[in-house]
Amino acid sequence: AIEKLSAAGYQYIGMDHFALPGDDLATAQEQGHLHRNFMGYTTHADCDLIGLGVSSISHIGDTYSQNPRDLPSWEIAIDNGRLPTWRGMSLDADDVLRADLIQQLMCHGDVYFAALEQRHDIEFEDYFRDDLARLKPLEADGLVERSLRGLKVTSRGRLLLRIIAACFDRYLQQPQSEPARFSKAI
């Protein structure tokens, strides 16, 4: 698919997104302003999103909420004049840091340690010791390169961005005995 769309003049943005050169997504990628949220790639960084329908997700500031997954529960809340929020969570400092890191990987294909260290007041190698250990097999497979300055996703790795990013998602690393959760970092 990538080869055919590229041959037709489309630019590969990431995962399942393509755009024509000059399109807002292509321009944002070229200028380093591309952003990703739970709906996909976008040019709108850090804007609040309000979900209205069944199972929809809202993102306001450092909080996420989700409406009920079933229509009857959603309708009952609406009929009673209530917001149909089923569950929600607030991001802590670790969530914000990991979201920043994963955003850099998914949108730009690289992470510069010094930039994250400065923005979040951490020592990258110490903070992400376990995560970097999980990344080692992907380095060995040629999907990501690690240097003293940072991480760079290879052209092969771009096809497996979710797997690379998952190394840094603490919610995906929870023991299997705990209930599965959607990633708060992506």
Regions found by a protein language model. Name each.
Residues 1-125, 185-186:
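C-terminal scaffold of the Radical SAM
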Residues 24-28, 137, 159:
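Short secondary-structure transition/capping segments
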Residues 84, 110-111, 144, 173-177:
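Intrinsically disordered or highly flexible coil/loop and linker segments, enriched in small
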Residues 124-139:
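Short amphipathic alpha-helical interaction segments
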Residues 139-149:
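A short, conserved structural fragment
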Residues 150-154:
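Minor-groove-contacting beta-hairpin "wing" of winged helix-turn-helix DNA-binding domains
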Residues 156-186:
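Short, amphipathic alpha-helical interaction segments positioned at domain boundaries
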